[in-house]
Every structure is written in structure tokens, then in C-alpha cells.
Amino acid sequence: MSEPELKINSQAVISAIERVCAALEAQQEYLTGLDQAVGDGDLGITVSKIAAALLEYVHTTPADDLGRFLGNAGMIANRAGSSTMGTLLATALMRAGKEVKGLAELTSANLAAMITVGDTGIQERGKANLGDKTVVDALHPAAEAFVASVQAGDNLNEAGQKMLTAAEAGRDAVTPLRSRSGRASWVGDRTIGQVDPGCAALVIILKAILD
């Protein structure tokens, strides 16, 4: 007899957000350095503001409806981080929340659906394509890897590790390229060989979730 599927409850979601916030705070200087090389250098302070706002939110807000909880978290992120990263993170959280409205627990299928709509939302909102050297180059292969792993019957840990590996590979694949989208594209060849800050932030987030 197969074991019952592991479900993710509200406390696990809160704990994951707490780990993500702590990781982003810890990597603030690293992300600032990456962003200074190719952009306006505000990514570190932006993620720090978002992390502080989200921590306050998760410590004071019931999470009995994870859809509503995540959707509101997206609005908090958008208000706290008035930048591209804040907008994209908010879009992903709000799309994911809408996908699981009314649920108190999440299955692997729920998570796969959330990741898929989050990926689609970020691509639509950011108007970036694969190869443009943006967060999409790490996020899209990560989402595809997670969904494929879940559909193959892997457990959540296995699917998560495959997702992280795909995100890291996507980040590394575009590092030698010239940025073709967003503020980074303005500095031209200076972006060649530089790690994309959005890709780097995504990898930090995924590592924290899986920790």
C-alpha cells in the first residue's frame, strides 16, 4: 500500500516564508553588489523591505485560507518593494493565492499549479522572454522541472531539489550573455559575464524554501 501524500499545512507555509525572509536579509549585500554591476543597485534594500513587511504580516495574520493569505502577502510585497522585483514577486504570490483559494492544506499538485501560474504571471508582467537574461531564465526551467517531477510521482523533496537544480542551471546558462530586458539592458556589454540579480534572488528563495 502506498503511503498517504504529504500535505503542506499553514504552519509549513509560514515557516517557509520566514526562512525566505531571513535568507534575503542575509544576502542583502550580495544582491546589492550584483545589482550595482548591472542596474541601479536597489535590489538588496528592496528585498530587505519586502522581507521585513512579510515577516510582520505572517506573524500577525491567520493562514487558515492559504489562498487569501498568499494573495494578501503579494499585496504587502508590492507596497513594501515599489520596484520591478516587488511587482514580480507580488504577481507570483497573488496568482498562486488565487489558484488555491479556500484551501488550508496544499498537495504536490496544488504546488505545481501555483508554480506554473506564478511563472506565467511573471513572464506576462515582466514581458521578458527566455534568453533575455532575467529571472525568467531561472524560474521557467525550475517550474517545468518541478511539475515534471511531481507528474512522475516524485515526492516533494525530490521535486524541490530538481526545481532548485534547474534554477541554478538556468542562472548559470545566461551569465555569459548580454542582458536584453529591463534596466540591465541599458548598460549593454557590461552585463556579459555578470550573474543576473533576479536569477540570483530566485535561487536564494528556492534554497530557503527547501532548507
Map each language-model feature to its residues:
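N-terminal loops that bind phosphate or other acidic moieties
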Residues: 1-211
